[in-house]
Amino acid sequence: DVFAEEKEGIPADQLVDHKIAVVGITAAVNPGVGIKDISKENLIKVFTGKITNWKDVGGKDQKIVLVNRPDASGTRAVFNKFGLDGATPAEGITEDSSNTVKKIVNETAGAVGYLALSYFTDDKVNPLSIDGVEPTDENVQSGKFPIWAYEHSYTKGEPSGATKEFLDYLMSDDVQNTLLKDQGYLPVTKMQVERDAKGNQTNK
């Protein structure tokens, strides 16, 4: 979920980055909170504890319950960087897995967490649009929806032999358009934008 350059102790200058897939992420709320869209400004206020009741963002009169992933989570790193613009979330419930986050948000009145888009397969939790932009595959691929990240494979130097063959296989149409989607990822080959390690986004 993160670039090698973002992790301390990794010799990123010796590695070659192969971006093989994309994951979109958005805030997930308990269906009872009563909202489907939130501004990024208010999303940041919710997760930093400056807004503590859903009625303040057009929802029900319910206390907001934050559900976070651990500090080491790639999903958390991506959500904090692109959803919260680098702000540090307030303390809340911390769960190790996305499946558990979904379960807790579903079972807890007023709860909000964050999940990859592939977890929104039923009505147990609701995905939030941000500033009116829905968290769809198409909006991630066009760059309209802001919270997404690459899945990386790194090699020490340029790949060769079986390693290169495997990476070529991962970039093939069969994998990009079928296998990745089955696993809940978006094909990197369909992205209309790209990002660098600093988070700068440009059109391809």
Where are these regions (language model features)?
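Exported/periplasmic ABC-transporter solute-binding proteins
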Residues: 1-204
